[in-house]
Amino acid sequence: MIYEGKAITVKALESGIVELKFDLKGESVNKFNRLTLNELRQAVDTIKADASIKGVIVSSGKDVFIVGADITEFVDNFKLPDAELVAGNLEANKIFSDFEDLNVPTVAAINGIALGGGLEMCLAADYRVMSTKAKIGLPEVKLGIYPGFGGTVRLPRLIGADNAIEWIAAGKENRPEDALKVGAVDAVVAPEKLQDAALELIKRAVSGEFDYKAKRQPKLEKLRLNAIEQMMAFETAKGFVAGQAGPNYPAPVEAIKTIQKAANFGRDKALEVEAAGFVKLAKTSAAQSLIGLFLNDQELKKKAKAYDEIAKDVKQAAVLGAGIMGGGIAYQSASKGTPILMKDINEHGIEQGLAEAAKLLVGRVDKGRMTAAKMAEVLNGIRPTLSYGDFGHVDLVVEAVVENPKVKQAVLAEVEDKVKEDTILASNTSTISISLLAKALKRPENFVGMHFFNPVHMMPLVEVIRGEKSSELAIATTVAYAKKMGKNPIVVNDCPGFLVNRVLFPYFGGFAKLVSAGVDFVRIDKIMEKFGWPMGPAYLMDVVGIDTGHHGRDVMAEGFPDRMKDDRRSAIDVLYEAKRLGQKNGKGFYAYEADKKGKQKKVADPSVLEVLKPIVYEQREVTDEDIINWMMIPLCLETVRCLEDGIVETAAEADMGLVYGIGFPPFRGGALRYIDSIGVAEFVALADQYADLGALYHPTAKLREMAKNGQSFFG
């Protein structure tokens, strides 16, 4: 062994060729933490000092190559002063440059995922051979930053500015054939041939058959574009990417600006430009929020994984109630490998459920994301039925019938008699108490809530609701099944609205107050969309359904009358009475028309103003900032209450629930991180300015205590 560390080893293979292997001890993946970077420096120095070494193959001892930088470690660095952070970045980059400058040829053998710093390591090599099972990419923009280990310098010089901009600004993972096509890798081979292919390539470079120094040279020079070509490439890209990313996500455009600024410099000066821009981005609130989301997501996955130890494997599932929701659940289960029975009480429901699943599958086939054979396999995994005949072998049943407690209780009690004693029953309810529904069951310990969000195939969140008598086995099995379906489960305790709807309705409450104060709902929508929401509250209410919102509002008012009950009629009441139910019947706050593709498109409908007139009680002058505060303060305070009441266990879960469940602006990080960004004391003072609007705007005693003590939700 030439070098041996805890993350990296260097050993001789044959004929002066060595293997530099990443294999971080005690971890399932390789990542660039301080230990790995230090050992890479030592390994490179060792290779440089050994004149007998003729070539280097870089490999991985794990199923992945390198997943990138250890963000949990590096996020602390982002708090350092700018100059210190720039110096640290350049010091790390010198390690990659020293590797690139070795006086021998180098080949990266990419066996699995190589992302971020993992791909940047590969770019520092002279050649790259990629397994057909691998994927590569630079996803840093998803964290609000851009590549900081030379990615903005080497990639454009290797594959051209246009291709590099597309890779870096999109932040997606790229398949082997796409990587080969643009020249990001030199060869793609079957996994079992990877080592031999890398060895063959390095031998040909060592022998002089391949000129590795000529291959390396473009990465060390300025970008090979003249002034006119640069202007065309960069200005066009900046305009297009700015339109795609929007003003709240600066990283993609900043990456292009950095490539442009560094275009006329050689590698070392270009790396200085990259470091300066990287530090600037790392300090933005968007980066801090998006990195916070990433860390929260890791915490969520860790918590969900902990349930695996006691979870029962769901080999056969069932859904009660077909229709669009049942069809979506059936599609999601079958497409992820769990066969499912789809039961309804009539043929129409079955047809609707199958049509929904088929529509989703055809969409995937049309986009090239699924083969026709796979589509047939998934459809075969959905078995429609009008009876309970085959329910004796079902491991978990999702009840998805109408949102009515008596109907749900009757259906659940009925199915309980048709399944095994240990079958888990899960109710897909958005507002009804799980403990209440459990009263109809003989085995309430086997019963939980499993709240899917609509549309099921698109929304990543599933709330798994623990009732008073739900067992840990039932919770664990439902969490594991949700994960198997490709969802992000969050376990919450039972209360009206659970987490997401309990927090959403105070937001709608703020909206109702604004409309009753004479504020134009179109203006409110525009301001909240500019704030970062995917759609404004009026449009969201139309999409959810005015009738659904009306029912949910009443449930929440009954559950929390002190702050959610309003004796005055509001916009949702008059729209409901006028049978303007939203998108579902073509008119709500807006009117809806089908576009050329048959997709619903909202249009202005002046007639709604007459409908709303009776609930406009005053004409109040409010600023754009007021509108944001009227909307956001109730949502944030209810999130705080959910955490204090133990409905959700951690701040991370609360914030992720809102991002995944209702589209809370990711660049703001979630409600609790949003409070942190303002400052807890400042937020309490802000809420107090709106105290006259009612109890929804009154901070809790505990939040006031946090403000007094200078505390925050995230350290």
From Swiss-Prot:
The active site is at H451 (for 3-hydroxyacyl-coa dehydrogenase activity). Disulfide bonds: none annotated. GO terms for molecular function: 3-hydroxybutyryl-CoA epimerase activity; delta(3)-delta(2)-enoyl-CoA isomerase activity; enoyl-CoA hydratase activity; long-chain-3-hydroxyacyl-CoA dehydrogenase activity; NAD+ binding. NAD(+) binds at M325, D344, V401, V402, E403, K408, S430, N454. Keywords: Fatty acid metabolism, Isomerase, Lipid degradation, Lipid metabolism, Lyase, Multifunctional enzyme, NAD, Oxidoreductase. GO terms for biological process: fatty acid beta-oxidation. Substrate binds at D297, N501, Y660. Its EC number is 4.2.1.17, 5.1.2.3, 5.3.3.8, 1.1.1.35. The keyword NAD applies. One of its GO terms (cellular component) is fatty acid beta-oxidation multienzyme complex. The record marks E120, E140 as: Important for catalytic activity. Residues 312-715 are annotated as: 3-hydroxyacyl-CoA dehydrogenase. Involved in the aerobic and anaerobic degradation of long-chain fatty acids via beta-oxidation cycle. Catalyzes the formation of 3-oxoacyl-CoA from enoyl-CoA via L-3-hydroxyacyl-CoA. It can also use D-3-hydroxyacyl-CoA and cis-3-enoyl-CoA as substrate. In the N-terminal section; belongs to the enoyl-CoA hydratase/isomerase family. In the C-terminal section; belongs to the 3-hydroxyacyl-CoA dehydrogenase family. Heterotetramer of two alpha chains (FadB) and two beta chains (FadA). This is Fatty acid oxidation complex subunit alpha. It comes from Pseudomonas fluorescens (strain Pf0-1). The gene is fadB.
